[in-house]
């Protein structure tokens, strides 16, 4: 079915179709003007045989009266092994100058969330091999994790380590959605992934990640839908290949922001703080598809930008309702050189309950947090009066807390290039055992430097003998 463009206002196009031949909502429409072709998505039916569509790329140079073809289906993107190691835009076209991919298997980006009978209801912990995460704020398999942190505290390195570890330990793959962030960051991430071996440029099918970018320079339609493009690729790995998949969304706030721009352009009445009235629905449609089924799981890690550090802003507040865990990166720890700079007291998880993780894990995590909290309270006294003014008991506690703080650091596989020390994957049992030994005072005679940037506790003991 073909119609013609009757109005263009920025990224919004009004298209008129012959009577009785209107396209369905969310269908893709291709508008062609000479060499230029723009794909749009139907958002509203206006009456008078007109639809209002939002463009996925720039509408510069388009004119009224040009032809518009209804494709009869939503935007569809390639899925499967061909996507690994490649960079896609919202329409599933490659943007890495390495040629096109074969569109043997394609899937529409709009789908229903899995039905209740398909879901895996028993909560299970997703082991990452990163001590601080597994012990203090464990991730749920098929859950959603919020990643909070400013610039330069190690967010990218943490993301790459997770991609690396899921491939090694779980045989899973990852999909990365760059939503409305800087193009330079997208390029840096791609180059770092090639350098660290997460993307194998010689043999792309051996890569561990597929990338979907809709960056800041894209129109709001593309930024609003690129998250769904990545999610569709992830769903294929989960449902068809029956794998555990990690889905990274950077940044979930930009998804909401793009939705807000589109909503205003479509003439909807804004709600609180100028956001779209459909905020909760749009967020829910994305988040409900991220889940654990009987076949496999999609575990999602979402970077959350908090506008003006106001946690009550509708965008972050709506996001929090969906999160199972939060990983907060701290500038103070990064300044001390403790990487990963995950704040052990600010990071939380709904999984940290004795009936889910077991009594030993729960007790050890609680004692670690108590020790670090007490150390934090004593820091003012230490700064003013010095360590010598503390009681014997408090001095012992401070010594153990400093060891714990250092033992929470860990050498990463993807950072071997910078640190020169080989990366370590630490199992949950080893993590619990190590922290329990420090808390029980079994290692009080070891120097605190021995615990810095090591894997398990045996390595710390070996390092102490060399010091």
Curated annotation (Swiss-Prot):
It catalyses: ATP + H2O + 4 H(+)(in) = ADP + phosphate + 5 H(+)(out). One of its GO terms (biological process) is response to cold. Keywords: ATP synthesis, ATP-binding, CF(1), Chloroplast, Hydrogen ion transport, Ion transport, Membrane, Nucleotide-binding, Plastid, Thylakoid, Translocase, Transport. ATP binds at residues 149-156. It is found in: Plastid, Chloroplast thylakoid membrane. GO terms for molecular function: ATP binding; ATP hydrolysis activity; mRNA binding; proton-transporting ATP synthase activity, rotational mechanism. It is a peripheral membrane protein. It comes from the Eukaryota. Its main location: plastid. Belongs to the ATPase alpha/beta chains family. HAMAP family: ATP_synth_beta_bact. F-type ATPases have 2 components, CF(1) - the catalytic core - and CF(0) - the membrane proton channel. CF(1) has five subunits: alpha(3), beta(3), gamma(1), delta(1), epsilon(1). CF(0) has four main subunits: a(1), b(1), b'(1) and c(9-12). Produces ATP from ADP in the presence of a proton gradient across the membrane. The catalytic sites are hosted primarily by the beta subunits. This is ATP synthase subunit beta, chloroplastic. It comes from Cyanidioschyzon merolae (strain NIES-3377 / 10D) (Unicellular red alga).
């Amino acid at each position: 079915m073909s119609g013609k463009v009757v109005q263009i206002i920025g990224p919004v196009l009004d298209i008129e179709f012959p009577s009785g031949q209107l396209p369905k909502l969310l269908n893709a429409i291709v508008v062609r003007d000479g060499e230029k072709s723009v794909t749009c998505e139907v958002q509203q039916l206006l009456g008078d045989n007109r639809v209002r569509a939002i463009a996925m790329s720039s509408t510069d140079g388009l004119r009224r009266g040009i032809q518009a073809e209804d494709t009869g289906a939503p935007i569809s993107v390639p899925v499967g092994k061909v996507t690994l190691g490649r960079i896609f835009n919202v329409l599933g076209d490659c943007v890495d100058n390495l040629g096109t991919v074969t569109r043997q298997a394609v899937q529409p980006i709009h789908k229903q969330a899995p039905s209740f009978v398909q879901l895996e209801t028993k909560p299970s912990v997703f082991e990452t091999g990163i001590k601080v995460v597994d012990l203090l704020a464990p991730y749920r398999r098929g859950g959603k994790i919020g990643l909070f942190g400013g610039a330069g505290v190690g967010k990218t390195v943490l993301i790459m380590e997770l991609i690396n570890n899921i491939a090694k330990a779980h045989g899973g793959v990852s999909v990365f959605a760059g939503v409305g962030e800087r193009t330079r960051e997208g390029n840096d991430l791609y180059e770092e992934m090639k350098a660290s071996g997460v993307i194998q440029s010689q043999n792309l099918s051996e890569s561990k990640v597929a990338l979907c970018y809709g960056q800041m320079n894209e129109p709001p339609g593309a930024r609003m839908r690129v998250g769904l493009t990545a999610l569709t690729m992830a769903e294929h790995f989960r449902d068809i290949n029956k794998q555990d998949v990690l889905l990274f969304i950077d940044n979930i706030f930009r998804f909401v922001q793009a939705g807000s721009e589109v909503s205003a352009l479509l003439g909807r009445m804004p709600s609180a703080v100028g956001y779209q009235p459909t905020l909760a629905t749009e967020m829910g449609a994305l988040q409900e598809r991220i889940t654990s089924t009987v076949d496999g799981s999609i575990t999602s890690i979402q970077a959350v930008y908090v506008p003006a550090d106001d946690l009550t802003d509708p965008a972050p507040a709506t996001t929090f309702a969906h999160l199972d865990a939060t990983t907060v990166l701290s500038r103070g720890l990064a300044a001390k050189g403790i990487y990963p700079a995950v704040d052990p007291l600010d990071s939380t998880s709904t999984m940290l309950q004795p009936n889910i993780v077991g009594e030993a894990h729960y007790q050890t995590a609680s004692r670690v947090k108590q020790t670090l909290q007490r150390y934090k309270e004593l820091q003012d006294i230490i700064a003013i009066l010095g360590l010598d003014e503390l009681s014997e008991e408090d001095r012992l506690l401070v010594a153990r807390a400093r060891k714990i703080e250092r033992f929470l650091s860990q050498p990463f596989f993807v950072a071997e290039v910078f640190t020169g020390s080989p990366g370590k994957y630490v199992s949950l049992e080893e993590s619990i055992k190590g922290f329990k030994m420090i808390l029980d005072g079994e290692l009080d005679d070891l120097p605190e430097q021995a615990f810095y940037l090591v894997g398990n506790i045996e390595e710390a003991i070996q390092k102490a003998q060399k010091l």
